């Protein structure tokens, strides 16, 4: 879902 995408982006940024 949308939150899954947000989590993926944050994970990619190392946040």
UniProtKB/Swiss-Prot annotation:
Leucine amide modification, residue list: 15
Secreted found in the keyword field: yes
Protein name: Caeridin-2
One GO-annotated biological process of the protein: defense response
Taxon lineage: Eukaryota, Metazoa, Chordata, Craniata, Vertebrata
Record flagged with keyword Secreted: yes
Alphabetically ordered keywords of this record: Amidation, Amphibian defense peptide, Secreted
Function: Caeridins show neither neuropeptide activity nor antibiotic activity.
Any GO CC annotation of this UniProt entry: extracellular region
Subcellular location(s) per record: Secreted
Tissue-specific expression: Expressed by the skin parotoid and/or rostral glands.
Native organism: Ranoidea gilleni
Disulfide pattern: none
């Amino acid at each position: 879902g949308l939150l899954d995408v947000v989590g993926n982006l944050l994970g990619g940024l190392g946040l």
